[in-house]
Amino acid sequence: QPLQEDDLFVFVACDDHQRVVGSILFSKLSFPNEENVFLLAPVAVATKWHGQGIGQALIRFGLEALKTKGVSIVMTYGDIRFYSKVGFTAINEERIQAPLTLSYPEGWLAQSLTGKAITPISGKPTCLEAIANPIYW
């Protein structure tokens, strides 16, 4: 299905010279029952800028922006040691399935933006075609 206006959000961080030093992307995870769930991927920060909190600041900013858009849950797939710093917790696929087979199931993470506990969502979601490649999962 074609991408809708509110299906994709991109945020960037720039240095003092307006050069991009970090970026994040949130895209809609489409479930059969129309849940309002987004996927955070990828998160990228220029090597020179690692360890300065840019990725965390971008993620926090993006999560707040999605909250104002009525997004209820954000998922991501990665290192719990990093993503737990911005509120993500591990979740198993019995509660929310990933769009593709996970090579590292411990890296499937979720965050509620409503303050409510995350309840199970039925059905397998689809993601953007650009990341619907098993190599990323």
Regions found by a protein language model. Name each.
Residues Q1-L25, L29:
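Active-site rim helix/loop that mediates acceptor-substrate recognition in acyltransferases
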Residues T68-S72, G78-S103:
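Conserved active-site alpha-helix within GNAT-family acetyltransferase domains
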Residues L40, V45, G51-E64, M75-T76:
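Conserved acetyl-CoA-binding loop-helix of GNAT-fold acetyltransferases
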Residues D15-Q18, K48, S112-A117:
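Short loop segments at secondary-structure junctions
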Residues L29-L40, H50:
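A conserved beta-turn-beta hairpin within the catalytic core of GNAT-like acetyltransferases
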Residues Q97-W137:
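C-terminal "cap" of GNAT-fold acetyltransferases
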Residues D6, H17, V21, A46-I54, ...:
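Non-catalytic interaction surface on structured domains
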